[in-house]
């Protein structure tokens, strides 16, 4: 989950694996908790400054619910493939190639400055029929502890950069908080700007490079948690991710599981 931005890239490399592991554990807990009780954790953390006392039961005028999406538009049996922390000039093209080979559409959760730095990749993602998701400006996994104004800038500045990079009027359709650090406010801001808050149910833990087999096994073991699977195309060497994604897509086909996009307008 840890996104290493520009100037700090070298200084924190040694600690990145440990931090990524901790984030992955937290993320899994978060995903399962959310599956059982949607929105509860975020409501407890942020109730004092929430402007939405219903804790996400609301829906914005354009019909985008504030609640975190876990379902698939492609039906109950479908799986949503989501790809985080890119785009990355080395690994995003490899991920795109695997998806194309399997004729699978995925949702790419991009970090604003990465999109700005690699607009050609954003355009490729859109041209291949995938969907865009806002993964903030700085991938601050503690943003849920910060001001609403800060959260708003993290979300809306990234949306602007991603859409500028995409061009052709392409829209960012989802918002995923880094490390699952959603708040009622951030969900409201996202929904008000046409972006459905998007969670995950299966963390493949690919970020920590546990080996291709471990990444594949995580999907097989945890797909019963829910339909949305988390992979990464950013944050370092993603060779295991590319291989594991290829195997997972073979396995899903064998299992008769279609793939699709996360729900946007249904609760
Ligand atoms: Zn991330």
Kindly give the residue locations of the regions a language model identified:
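N-terminal pre-catalytic segment of deacetylase/amide-hydrolase enzymes
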Residues: 2-81, 88-101, 123, 247-267
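Generic signal for short, ordered secondary-structure residues
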Residues: 11, 77-78, 104, 169, ...
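Compositionally biased, intrinsically disordered low-complexity segments enriched
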Residues: 46-47, 136-137, 234
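A general, composition-driven signal for non-globular sequence regions
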Residues: 3-7, 24, 129, 133, ...
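Active-site beta->alpha N-cap acidic-glycine motif
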Residues: 52-150, 154-157, 161, 172
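Hydrophobic alpha-helical membrane segments, chiefly transmembrane helices and signal peptide h-regions
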Residues: 18-33, 131, 198, 223, ...
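Catalytic domains of cell-wall/extracellular-matrix polysaccharide-remodeling enzymes
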Residues: 94, 116-117, 139-257, 263-267
